[in-house]
């Protein structure tokens, strides 16, 4: 697929930027979003923290408000209240306060060591997954997204590809059309009666 080729370095930066730009000129369809999601999940480094029944609290980013990272702050609050949280995020592509920027400033050392994440869950009720460590395609597009400095369809994909596949998710979006798109996407992915995943 396209994302697998990106992950394997088969396209140069100009070609990848061109692909991203296509979806700035027209809206992405549900089918395209689901296809990209499937490809990213297929390439992910899987992480099993299901014993904690965690929630992911995440926003798409790209709202242009330049606020502090509210979803990451909410993760700390929820974890402090005793609810297990598995946060999946990245450096800001359109802002200075992506989840990874916030975590790094708080001294978090990014890791893909599942045992270390499990210890973090046991001690603090929270584990952080820095997206590029868990998906080669997200790592490959990161500098291109930063260079474009505009909201792209990767803002939409990020919240859908947490490698833990958490049981619950609280998701913030930047506009009503995107909320509707996510609603259709979640309905497609809840045909197995896993109703928690539809609580967008």
For each predicted feature, which ranges?
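Acidic, glycine/proline-rich low-complexity segments that act as flexible tails and inter-domain linkers
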Residues: 1-67, 81
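Residue-level signal for inorganic ion chemistry
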Residues: 19, 103, 158
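Glycine/serine-rich anion-binding loops at beta->alpha junctions
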Residues: 54-96, 154-155, 161
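Active-site-proximal loop->helix
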Residues: 92-108
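A glycine-rich helix N-cap at a beta->alpha junction
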Residues: 105-120
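Phosphate/diphosphate-binding glycine-rich loops and adjacent basic-rich segments that engage nucleotide
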Residues: 116-172
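Gly/Ser/Thr-rich active-site loops/lids in small-molecule metabolic enzymes
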Residues: 171-185
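Conserved small/polar residues in nucleotide/adenosyl-binding loops
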Residues: 189-196
